[in-house]
Amino acid sequence: MIGIFDSGVGGMTVAQAVEQALPEQRLIYFGDLARTPYGSKSPETITNYARQNTQFLIDQGAKLIIIACNTAASIASDTLHREFDLPIFEVITPAVAKAVATTKSGRVGVIGTRATINSNIYEEKICALATRAKVFSQPCPLLVPLVEEGWLDKRETKMILRRYLSPL
């Protein structure tokens, strides 16, 4: 069984992609709606949440974990790899590979929670793959609550996104 966790429902897109790619595999998804958003919490708290989520999924029978939360992956991935003896994947590495492969100018914009941006994980991984890349990072603390509330197509969300993306 594959266990997938996120701080909310955004990781359902990851679960859907895994289900399409591996239809014979059983999945369990844990969206931590009780403690979302993670992005404004301390690294210690985020790591503890990720540890608890991973253990919960293992207790349910998961033999492989996917961290579908950028914030948890950026802060706790190394700890989870050290502490748990099973395959653990995260969403950052494939996103970085796609960004590096897609950019024509060598410029890559990254948006995320404060914790994700402050971890510098995207910049480190992008520059490891493309040493001449220029990375422009922008924290977007209001984005997670808007997405979780289903406000993707609202005028207010578009205004906030324009504001966040203008420096990029």
Residue ranges: model-predicted function:
Residues 1-168:
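Non-catalytic structural scaffold of enzyme domains
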